[in-house]
């Protein structure tokens, strides 16, 4: 469990938190603890010849939990024969055989791999219509009651604060019923369905009252996207506008979350307001930045009284005066700024983020999709090339499912016309167009369509690299197998994926590596791609070249690094920002509305420029030089 930088009085016991919270560094660690509690309960019940009644959730959060339970069944011989399950919810309408159904989800991730009795499995029926739905809901409540009630209810949480599909406005006494889904919930489901118009707008869900009757409740949440709603639920007032806050009234509830999901809790965000903290350089920087933002003052204008009035007297005691704190933090921030991301050759690098030598460096820039590098660090990428380094662009996945069918059709028209003008056969292009015309709105895309979409995105990446001066022989398309399913649902990361990255690393032997640390979605492609790189590092970490390799994590497509975390800030001039924009433009299939925009409807170049300008503005308001924009990076230290 994470306890660094603060000394908690107990498991989440502080004046801000109204629900017990257990924080783990990673979801992997957290699910092991939850799985052990479930298994202990199952086995205790079995020893008394009793049934164990579990309420189960779907969605991203419980996937790793179910994987751990399956592992315990296979490797430790844990039996689930005495388990009765009731699932929280199901979309309406939803055929059971659909990959998007929770019936399919539960069997795919859990039930097909353990020894549970099929007659003990209960999942809401998404095929029902009209009065059948109400009758089913009444019978579902009766079935839970007949089973003796739920012993342990597992929950996730939606960004609206929904538990199950109990959206804002749900009553604490509500029972199993048909509901209409919130707009944000529908947006979050697009990644599972492929497009908004395929996401159902209704569902069957257990009620808040049904959940509250469970004897024990564990809510799990992973990733930064969940941080705001976790804070609102744990520290906010009870309100039907955030249904999860009703859990504050449950006598036996536990939130189990990872460090990212906990990042906005007061004990993580402002730990000095909770208890005595262990001040390190990053936490001191964070406290001073927050104070500057609150008071709208630059660092060097903060006074003793400002620290004393805002719970930061410890810093005065530690340093002796506000002036000494200010100078230390100002210098700390100033030293993150570098116009030489690859290191300035033959210069004193004692206060620079990157070492001067060797020069030039071999640089690997990993990009989860074929445009993430230019979106997130295009200015830095161009500068590395300009300053003479051997820059390699590495595209981990094809990104093929993010190409609209209409756009590919247009490209096939162009290719067909070229073929006609050159007097060669364009029959293949005509066949692709015919395939596109006959595509069904759901399901995996045909391989021939995916092949051309892959080629299209590769050509766009080559064009962007060519524009920035990266030769084609230094552009690497890995097409990692985990991604190549032809649908939004991906395979699990495997050894084949890791080996591909290991082989490239050992071939190039880079002095510098850049990788996407944009983990807004902890089970999205960015996270999986970073996990693949980290697992590859585990393999090569004893290689001589790796011991002298710096690893930098970038963001920018979805979120930006907070100022207190930044290790290197690269200024971007107006002309360099224009170069970055032009490189992004080369990815034509992603312009005029990306396939998976998330919450932000703007083009990627607009998002990136705003984030880069906001970062420069932060530095300027803290008292640093004024730049047009900045791209920022966090250094990753493997094994530390």
Per-segment meaning from a language model:
Residues 53, 84, 151-152, 216, ...:
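Structural motif
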Residues 65-76, 374-398, 402:
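Histidine-anchored nucleotide/phosphate-binding helix
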Residues 186-194, 198-203, 296, 301-364, ...:
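Metal-dependent de-N-acetylase/amidase catalytic core
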Residues 45-50, 145-149, 503-511, 516:
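Glycine-rich phosphate-binding loop signature in dinucleotide/nucleotide-binding domains
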Residues 2, 6-8, 25, 29-30, ...:
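Conserved phosphate- and dinucleotide-binding cores of soluble alpha/beta proteins
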Residues 65-72, 164-175, 523-539:
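Short Gly/Thr/Asp-enriched flexible loops that form oxyanion-binding sites at enzyme active sites
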Residues 13-139, 143-146, 391:
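N-terminal active-site beta-alpha-beta segment that forms phosphate/nucleotide-binding
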């Amino acid at each position: 469990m994470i306890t660094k930088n603060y000394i908690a009085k107990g498991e989440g016991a502080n004046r801000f938190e109204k629900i017990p919270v257990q924080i783990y560094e990673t979801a992997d660690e957290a699910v092991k603890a939850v799985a052990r509690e479930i298994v202990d309960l199952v086995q205790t019940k079995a020893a008394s010849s009793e049934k164990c009644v579990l309420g189960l959730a779907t969605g991203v959060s419980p996937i790793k939990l179910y994987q751990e339970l399956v592992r315990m069944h296979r490797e430790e011989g844990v039996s689930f024969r005495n388990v009765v399950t009731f699932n929280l919810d199901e979309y309406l309408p939803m055929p059971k055989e659909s990959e998007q159904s929770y019936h399919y989800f539960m069997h795919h991730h859990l039930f097909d791999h353990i020894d549970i009795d099929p007659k003990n499995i209960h999942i809401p029926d998404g095929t029902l219509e009209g009065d059948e739905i109400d009758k089913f809901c009444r019978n579902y409540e009766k079935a839970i009651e007949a089973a003796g009630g739920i012993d342990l209810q597992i929950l996730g949480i939606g960004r609206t604060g929904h538990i199950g599909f109990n959206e804002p406005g749900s009553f604490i006494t509500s029972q199993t019923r048909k509901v209409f889904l919130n707009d944000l919930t529908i947006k979050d489901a697009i990644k599972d369905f492929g497009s908004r118009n395929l996401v159902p707008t209704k569902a069957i869900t257990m009620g808040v009252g049904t959940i509250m009757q469970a004897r024990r409740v564990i809510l799990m949440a992973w990733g930064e996207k969940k941080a705001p709603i976790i804070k609102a639920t744990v520290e906010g007032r009870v309100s039907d506008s955030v249904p999860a806050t009703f859990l504050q009234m449950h006598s036996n509830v536990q939130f189990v979350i990872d460090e990212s999901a906990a990042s906005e809790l007061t004990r993580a965000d402002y730990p000095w307001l909770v208890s005595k903290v262990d001040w390190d350089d990053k936490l001191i920087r964070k406290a001073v930045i927050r104070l500057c933002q609150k008071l709208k003052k630059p660092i060097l204008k903060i006074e003793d009284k400002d620290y004393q009035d805002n719970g930061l007297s410890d810093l005065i005691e530690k340093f002796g005066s506000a002036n000494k704190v200010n100078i230390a933090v100002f210098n700390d921030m100033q030293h993150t700024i570098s116009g030489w991301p690859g290191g300035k050759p033959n210069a004193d690098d004692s206060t620079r983020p990157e070492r001067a030598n060797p020069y030039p460096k071999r640089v690997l820039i990993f990009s989860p999709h074929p445009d993430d590098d230019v979106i997130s660090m295009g200015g830095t990428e161009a500068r590395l090339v300009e300053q003479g380094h051997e820059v390699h662009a590495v595209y981990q996945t094809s990104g093929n499912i993010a190409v609209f069918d209409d756009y590919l059709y247009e490209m096939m028209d162009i290719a067909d016309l070229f073929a006609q003008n050159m007097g060669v056969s364009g029959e293949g292009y005509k066949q692709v167009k015919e395939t596109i015309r006959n595509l069904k709105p759901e399901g995996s895309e045909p391989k021939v369509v995916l092949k051309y979409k892959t080629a299209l995105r590769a050509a766009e990446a080559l064009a962007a690299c060519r524009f920035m001066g990266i030769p084609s022989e230094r552009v690497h398309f890995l097409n990692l197998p985990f991604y190549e399913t032809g649908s939004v649902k991906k395979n699990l990361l495997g050894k084949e994926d890791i080996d591909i990255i290991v082989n490239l690393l050992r071939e190039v032997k880079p002095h510098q590596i850049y990788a996407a640390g944009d983990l807004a979605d902890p089970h999205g492609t960015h996270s999986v791609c970073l996990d693949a790189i980290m697992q590859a590092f585990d393999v090569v970490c004893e290689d001589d070249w790796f011991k002298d390799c710096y690893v930098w994590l970038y963001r920018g497509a979805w979120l930006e690094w907070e100022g207190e975390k930044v290790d290197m800030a690269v200024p971007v001039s107006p002309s360099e920002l224009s170069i970055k924009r032009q490189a992004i433009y080369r990815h034509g299939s992603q312009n005029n509305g990306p396939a998976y925009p998330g919450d932000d409807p703007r083009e990627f170049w607009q998002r990136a420029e705003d984030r880069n300008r906001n970062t420069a503005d932060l530095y300027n308001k803290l008292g640093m030089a004024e730049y047009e924009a900045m791209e920022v990076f966090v250094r990753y230290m493997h094994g530390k």
